């Protein structure tokens, strides 16, 4: 049997880039909680002993950004200079400007409304008033290889990262520090199905003087085996023959912002599908939902998941594209990789009929103008069985099935 190896990685909330994502999204949530119409684009940079917060905001409220930064760092676990970073004493600089008026006018009044106001005519749908916050393309993906409709490698990598953080915070494994990464490799058969766990890599920051052999066994028992058992993979896709590598480079004492500088938006593959699907390039964290980089990608996951949940395909990838200041998408594309159970043209027609992908409609349908974003800043934005996220709902299954049946009858 011909097998191919596919790998995906995850990182913990103490990874420098994820620290930045968390800070940016904490600021976003604090603003949206007080001002649902806030326009936010916040970027964070962390380095040894210092946090920079920059970006553009338009809002009617105020939040104490330095206090939010410090609280976030302490919640993650950077609370002592002994580990190279302390949220209580680090420097925090803030350089926030106002959203560009040119961008604001295009988003507040979409091209459709501006053209209508100039030419007159019948009254337009109010959903057409909000233009896309930028041009760009977004992808959504779903597969039936896991109950959460996610690729197995990234789903397992995220579970391992979450568990690594859990055993640290609960003291189940002592001497761990916040920074960490996981990576999972599965063997796939010619039909594209995962058949065997091949390799697991866990790198975790730890206190000085820890024996790596002891740490290896702690991670095997309390992290890897725990997750495999919980996921129902032990003795199934994961027998005892897989390779486990724990801190393969040796000691990992120097981590977090002291080990590497971090930046918002640098873990876009970790945030999405672990490389199993394409990515439009736009990051999520620190962006309010008028930015289609975020809301468009969430909507595409919603679409793709409902396609697969409806039994219309085993795998689905959906692309949407927008022009800045225009409400109506400029493109929509459905790919099912030969796994479709109905003609792709019928599925695509059904998607157009069932889902309104104008930015204002997405905000309304998914109820995105609320503080739900900080919880997604680590361990993935999709397939989160531990969270109730609106884009994970399979509430359009029946409508899609009916629309596909109608489209086939009309052909």
Swiss-Prot record:
Residues passing through the membrane, by range: none
EC number: 2.5.1.6
Domain of life of the organism encoding this protein: Bacteria
Region annotation Flexible loop: where it falls in the sequence: 99-109
Keywords of this entry: ATP-binding, Cytoplasm, Magnesium, Metal-binding, Nucleotide-binding, One-carbon metabolism, Potassium, Transferase
Positions contributing to K(+) binding: 43
Annotated cofactor note: Binds 2 divalent ions per subunit. Binds 1 potassium ion per subunit.
Keyword Transport (UniProt): no
An MF annotation (GO) of this entry: ATP binding
Pathway noted in the entry: Amino-acid biosynthesis; S-adenosyl-L-methionine biosynthesis; S-adenosyl-L-methionine from L-methionine: step 1/1
Binding site for Mg(2+): 17
One GO CC annotation: cytoplasm
Cofactor: Mg(2+); K(+)
GO annotation (BP), single: S-adenosylmethionine biosynthetic process
Residue numbers binding ATP: 15, 179-181, 260, 266-267, 283, 287
Chief place where the protein resides: cytoplasm
Sequence positions that bind L-methionine: 56, 99, 260, 291
Cellular compartment(s): Cytoplasm
UniProt-listed PANTHER family: S-ADENOSYLMETHIONINE SYNTHETASE (PTHR11964)
Subunit-structure text: Homotetramer; dimer of dimers.
Function noted in UniProt: Catalyzes the formation of S-adenosylmethionine (AdoMet) from methionine and ATP. The overall synthetic reaction is composed of two sequential steps, AdoMet formation and the subsequent tripolyphosphate hydrolysis which occurs prior to release of AdoMet from the enzyme.
Family: Belongs to the AdoMet synthase family.
Protein name per the record: S-adenosylmethionine synthase
């Amino acid at each position: 049997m011909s097998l191919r190896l596919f790998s995906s990685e995850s990182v913990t909330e103490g990874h420098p880039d994820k620290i930045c994502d968390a800070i940016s999204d904490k600021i976003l949530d604090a603003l949206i909680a007080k001002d649902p119409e806030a326009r936010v684009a916040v970027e964070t940079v962390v380095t040894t002993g210092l946090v920079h917060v920059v970006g553009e905001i338009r809002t009617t409220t105020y939040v104490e950004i330095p206090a939010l930064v410090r609280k976030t760092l302490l919640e993650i676990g950077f609370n002592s200079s002994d580990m190279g970073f302390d949220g209580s004493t680090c420097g925090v600089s803030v350089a926030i400007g106002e959203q560009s008026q040119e961008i604001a006018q295009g988003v507040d009044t979409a091209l459709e409304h501006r053209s209508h106001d100039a030419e007159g005519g019948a009254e337009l749908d109010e959903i057409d008033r909000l233009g896309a916050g930028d041009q760009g393309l977004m992808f959504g993906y779903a597969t039936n290889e896991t109950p959460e409709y996610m690729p197995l490698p990234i789903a397992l990598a995220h579970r391992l990262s979450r568990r690594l953080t859990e055993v640290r915070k609960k003291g189940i494994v002592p001497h761990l520090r916040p920074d960490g990464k996981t990576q999972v490799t599965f063997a796939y058969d010619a039909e594209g199905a995962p058949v065997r766990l091949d390799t697991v890599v866990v790198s975790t920051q730890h206190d000085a003087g820890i024996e790596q052999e002891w740490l290896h066994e702690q991670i095997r028992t309390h992290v890897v085996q725990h997750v495999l058992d919980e996921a129902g993979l032990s003795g199934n896709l994961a027998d005892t023959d897989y390779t486990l590598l724990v801190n393969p480079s040796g000691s990992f004492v120097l981590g977090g912002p002291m080990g590497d500088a971090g930046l918002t938006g640098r873990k876009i593959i970790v945030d999405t599908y672990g490389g199993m699907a394409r990515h439009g390039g736009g990051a999520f964290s620190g962006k309010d939902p008028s930015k289609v980089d975020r809301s468009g990608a969430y909507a595409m996951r919603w679409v793709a998941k409902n396609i697969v949940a409806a039994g219309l395909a085993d795998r689905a990838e959906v692309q949407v594209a927008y022009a800045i200041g225009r409400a109506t998408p400029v493109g929509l594309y459905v790919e099912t990789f030969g796994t479709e159970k109905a003609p792709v043209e019928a599925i695509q027609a059904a998607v157009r009929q069932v889902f309104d992908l104008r930015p204002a409609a997405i905000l309304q349908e998914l109820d995105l103008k609320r503080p739900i974003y900080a919880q997604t800043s680590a361990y993935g934005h999709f397939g989160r069985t531990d969270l109730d996220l609106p884009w994970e709902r399979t509430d359009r299954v029946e409508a899609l099935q009916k629309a596909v049946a109608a489209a086939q009858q009309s052909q």
